[in-house]
């Protein structure tokens, strides 16, 4: 059965993360049968990491605040998590299903495909987003 996505519900969750006035900094998109739907959301990145277990595949849209004291900016990451125990067929489908998620999640600085929990560490993601951001005008603090 072909995978579908609940676009309206996923778009509402996506916009909640994009809203700087919202405390929500992450949302997951999970499989409910053959349909991708919004999953959990929250204001604590560590709580997001707890969603990424070995038997799960999910997509996540996460907001990080970067920059220095003079210039704070929101950077967004699209994370595809594929747990170690996910079957080969489901792994393969995750790649094609991501195109459905990208119909909703269109603005992000960097995309990650992760199956190792170490790569979910906040410092790693932040450093990758900083690299993707181009020029570093924060040199005086280094």
UniProtKB/Swiss-Prot annotation:
Subunit structure: Interacts with 5-lipoxygenase (ALOX5/5LO) in a calcium-independent manner. Binds to F-actin with a stoichiometry of 1:2.
Family membership: Belongs to the actin-binding proteins ADF family. Coactosin subfamily.
Chain segments carrying region Flexible and important for F-actin binding: 66-75
Disulphide bonds in the chain: none
Modified residue annotations for N6-acetyllysine: 102
UniProt function note: Binds to F-actin in a calcium-independent manner. Has no direct effect on actin depolymerization. Acts as a chaperone for ALOX5 (5LO), influencing both its stability and activity in leukotrienes synthesis.
Classification via PROSITE patterns: ADF_H
Signal peptide extent: none
Protein name as catalogued: Coactosin-like protein
Span of domain ADF-H: 2-130
Location in or out of the cell: Cytoplasm; Cytoplasm, Cytoskeleton; Nucleus
SMART domains: ADF
A Gene Ontology term for the protein's cellular component: cytosol
Biological process, per Gene Ontology: defense response to fungus
Keywords: Acetylation, Actin-binding, Chaperone, Cytoplasm, Cytoskeleton, Nucleus, Phosphoprotein
Family annotation (Pfam families): Cofilin_ADF (PF00241)
A GO molecular-function descriptor: actin binding
Residue(s) carrying N-acetylalanine: 2
């Amino acid at each position: 059965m072909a995978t579908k996505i609940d676009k309206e519900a996923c778009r509402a969750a996506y916009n909640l993360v994009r809203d700087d006035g919202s405390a929500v900094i992450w949302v997951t998109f999970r499989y409910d049968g053959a349909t991708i739907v919004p999953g959990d959301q929250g204001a604590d990145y560590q709580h997001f990491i707890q969603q990424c277990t070995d038997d799960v595949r999910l997509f996540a849209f996460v907001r990080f605040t970067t920059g220095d004291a003079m210039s704070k900016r929101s950077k967004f990451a699209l994370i595809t998590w594929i747990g170690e125990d996910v079957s080969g067929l489901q792994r393969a489908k995750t790649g094609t299903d991501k195109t459905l998620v990208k119909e909703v999640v269109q603005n992000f600085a960097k995309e990650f495909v992760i199956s190792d929990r170490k790569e979910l560490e906040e410092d790693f993601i932040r450093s990758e987003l900083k690299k993707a951001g181009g020029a570093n005008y924060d040199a005086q603090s280094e």
